[in-house]
Amino acid sequence: MTNELPEIGSPARTKAILNRYRLVAKKSLGQNFLSDLNILRNIVAAGDVNDHDNVIEIGPGIGALTEQIAKRAHKVVAFEIDENLLPVLDETLMDYKNVKIINEDILKANLPAVVADEFEADRPLKLVANLPYYITTPILMGVLQSTVRFEAIVVMMQAEVAERLVAEPGTKAYGSLSVIMQYRAHVEIAFNVPRTAFIPQPNVDSAIIRLTPREALPVNPYEDKALFSFVKGCFAHRRKSLWNNLQGIFGKQPEVRERIETVLNQTGISRQLRPERLTLLNFIELTNAFHNEGLM
């Protein structure tokens, strides 16, 4: 390295870059620039990134996290939707030849094609990113449902959303997002990030989530889409009993009610339970049972 400038994620360098390019964080893109080197390094460490790994990043901003990843990874491909940041990244990351920036919306990108074109197939692939908070869930669902196999996913998100992802049955935060995300991956909070670590400061606290995509479950639904739809329907009125929510999904006709009762008896799940008490495996079991009963 010939560049002796402070690292991009230091407060002084971040402010200098923002001032030089007259950059203002765009609320429409959920932009806040992380300017704490310890946190940036800890994010990369949470993904256990090493020189054998290929890494996808989403929303590199001015390159603060990208730099820390590039120092440890074999190669980094980062998706940046904001064209105004491209010349900034060209400058800030000019010394890192193992970084490629793609100016594309990750929600519209052909991720399998990008991975096939940019990375060797025999290297582990990881996702490490400070996600735009307003599209955190669509990004994660898209990534987890794609054919691309990630060894690990480490992302920053709003702390409140993170709590929902890791929530357990019977807790206030437990809901459809908890069930669906935990179906796709083992989820844990690596650590929390205070709002003071950003320029400008957001109005919410943040957390780093680590997801490890699942290999297999003891029981699998006959169809993922059906499971997701069923789970969302069960949580449509979370204060109501499972029985009432099931009638909302399938109908209240006498014949339908009888078939719902049959499934509940078969599975041994009480009609009086609220959906928040059901486990992931309960939801899968019910999805398959209602399918077998001809209701799905």
UniProtKB/Swiss-Prot annotation:
Task: Write out the residues that bind S-adenosyl-L-methionine.
Answer: 32, 34, 59, 80, 105, 130
Q: Which Gene3D superfamilies match?
A: Ribosomal RNA adenine dimethylase-like, domain 2, Vaccinia Virus protein VP39
Q: Which Pfam families match?
A: RrnaAD
What domain of life does the UniProt record list for this protein's source?
Answer: Bacteria
Q: Which reactions appear under catalytic activity for this entry?
A: adenosine(1518)/adenosine(1519) in 16S rRNA + 4 S-adenosyl-L-methionine = N(6)-dimethyladenosine(1518)/N(6)-dimethyladenosine(1519) in 16S rRNA + 4 S-adenosyl-L-homocysteine + 4 H(+)
Quick one: where is this thing mainly located? cytoplasm
GO MF annotation: an example: RNA binding
EC number(s) given by UniProt: 2.1.1.182
Q: Name one GO cellular component term.
A: cytosol
Record keywords: Cytoplasm, Methyltransferase, RNA-binding, rRNA processing, S-adenosyl-L-methionine, Transferase
Where is this gene product found? Cytoplasm
Which family, according to UniProt?
Belongs to the class I-like SAM-binding methyltransferase superfamily. rRNA adenine N(6)-methyltransferase family. RsmA subfamily.
The task this protein performs is described as:
Specifically dimethylates two adjacent adenosines (A1518 and A1519) in the loop of a conserved hairpin near the 3'-end of 16S rRNA in the 30S particle. May play a critical role in biogenesis of 30S subunits.
Q: What name has this protein been given in UniProt?
A: Ribosomal RNA small subunit methyltransferase A
Query: What is the originating organism of this protein?
Result: Levilactobacillus brevis (strain ATCC 367 / BCRC 12310 / CIP 105137 / JCM 1170 / LMG 11437 / NCIMB 947 / NCTC 947) (Lactobacillus brevis)
Protein encoded by which gene: rsmA
